[in-house]
Amino acid sequence: MINEIKKDAQARMKKSLESLEHAFAKIRTGRAHPSILDGVMVSYYGADTPLRQVANVVAEDARTLALTVFDKSMIQAVEKAIMTSDLGLNPATAGTTIRVPMPALTEETRKGYTRQARAEAESARVAVRNIRRDALAQLKDLVKEKEISEDEERRAADEVQKLTDKAIAEVDKALEAKEADLMAV
């Protein structure tokens, strides 16, 4: 019973951390990374399709992404989708390859992205704390139903707190790494 609550809390905290990593991947740094274009949707025969399904995206070098479009007739649509996305990127077509140079980040944009990263990290911390609160509430319910003793509840609560501390430390570590990445010129 107690182990199930701890495992559930641990799994949910892990999902929160994965969600944070995914959110951080969308925040653009000065370097080219294929995940930057993950949110771009292309109009493919009238239906919005993720860019990854119509083109192969690779980092050509530190500041350039190269896209190889599977269907040659889609080159203009892919180029338009990248331009209309709110990423501030200007693709250049060279034959069958679309190159997307990454503009250098200004100090102001870096600070804006850092603020965004901190907000994402804070929402991850809040999610982890809410998971802890839910787990502690479940433990209290077990005590009320006399399924576990108060000592067992206290021990389990300490273990849940350790899981929470570990998860929040991982959030802080991920934020620190992202901030360092953003501020590196």
Swiss-Prot record:
Establish whether keyword Cytoplasm is in the entry: yes
Pfam families with a match to the protein in the record: RRF
Q: Which CDD domains does the UniProt entry name for this protein?
A: RRF
Q: Which organism is it from?
A: Azotobacter vinelandii (strain DJ / ATCC BAA-1303)
**One of the GO BP terms on file:** cytoplasmic translational termination
Q: Where is this gene product found?
A: Cytoplasm
- Gene Ontology MF terms in the entry: ribosomal large subunit binding
Q: Which domain of life is it from?
A: Bacteria
Name-wise, this protein is Ribosome-recycling factor
What HAMAP family does this protein map onto? RRF
